[in-house]
Amino acid sequence: MDTSTETVTTRNGEWLHISSPRQYILQRQVNLTPQAEAKPALSVTLIPNEFDLIDGNAAVQYMQALAFAEQHNALEQLREFQRKGRREVEAGGEDPSQAEPNIWLETAPSDLPLERVRAYLGYSSFQTRYLDEALKRRGCDFDRNIREAKDPVGYLIPEIQMMRELSRLQSMRFRLAIAEARIQDAIQIFAQQLAMGHHLDEEDFIVSNLVGIACADIGVSDAYYLSETAAAPNLYWAIAALPQPLVSMRRALAYERELAFEQFKQFREVDEIPQPAIYWQRFVAELAEEAKDWSDTGFGELEEFETPAAQAMLIGAAYPGAKFFLTEELGMESDKVEALPVTQVVFLGMRRLYEQLRDDSFKLQYLPSPQRAGFSPYQAEMAAKDKYGWITVLNNLFLPAVQAAGSARDRLQQQLALLQTIEALRDHMAAHDGRLPELLSELRLPAPNDPVTLQPFEYVYEAGQAKLAGAVTNAIKYELVLVPAVEGNSP
């Protein structure tokens, strides 16, 4: 049977996952409670403002929160709790993902087994004081000194992956706080999630930025429970005051742009100045030696050639493509190219092609999201591989999925803007007997534009309810079904 047009719907906690061939919709019902803007307007904050931030290094607090060095018994109890949960669901033939405590990440606050959640979170309760302190710190520096690393691609950052798990614990703490009506604690935890994302923006690696985005994303997804809680203050101005964007990725993008030359530093020496044959023999030998550990990462094309004869065969085969690129694409004079050693032509072509395609990809990150939509650097990379062959090896290995990373950044900003719009709607409801507006233009507090399109969000009002949706980013679309809260449909 042809299922090419089939739509599949599954549920993950409060979110419906609606999958179709064209897009993936994440939909949540939000039972909105009326709440006017805070008075004074900036009395509620998430990330502290510049006056209140403390000069200091949040990385110290995060490492202390992740360290169970003095908490051996607590760590073992926490792990035993996890093992017991897995054993229980496996004995019943259920999916291990449904085991406690992980299932609590999909459980509404009102449905949590409170005593068990309190017991589990008690094993890591020491973390909260460090996260409180991290929130107040202006900077975050893990002191990597990455520019001095001999093998930056092999640099391990396990503490960053551990922060993702820390964020999951924070989500459980948030849900428990909502269940226990500890609203200020819930807001503090939400703020800490956002601060983790913003602090990880100071890292040199895109993967660290993406973990930061994931931490903030968990916080934003949880924050809808605040919008559903009558006692929760309005967060409109607190969201408006956040850094824009929360995770810029500028530092990591700058480092990733140079990563190929940081890993293989000898490529920085490759230029148009003629070098003797002995220079290129040494260059190839050093490069082949460095690439020996890269067989599983895409550089096997060089590693496989262990003898000078095999290397000469590879370089000879790559020469025509490199020469064509240098002369036809870059406009170098043919006689000058032909005067260079064959190996120099190949690696010069490799460097210049990499630089050109790299910048064609990275430059788009300096444009607003809607202006990037008409470009497709990936297609140019694939066309270059077909046209020039082996000299595209640096591009194959070192050009990260920059566009996908940029989409993740845009999606986080979109979610924050959706949440800010929700808070503007709460303010409207407070002045209109709990009713939603028919149009976003009726709002007293202006709804932000969708950061993905720089246009107003999609908003459809019908019969007292509404649907608020963002534009599709990387085939993912967020939809919020807005229902005025009545007794029994809020946390």
Model-derived segments and their meaning:
Residues 1-491:
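Short acidic linear motifs
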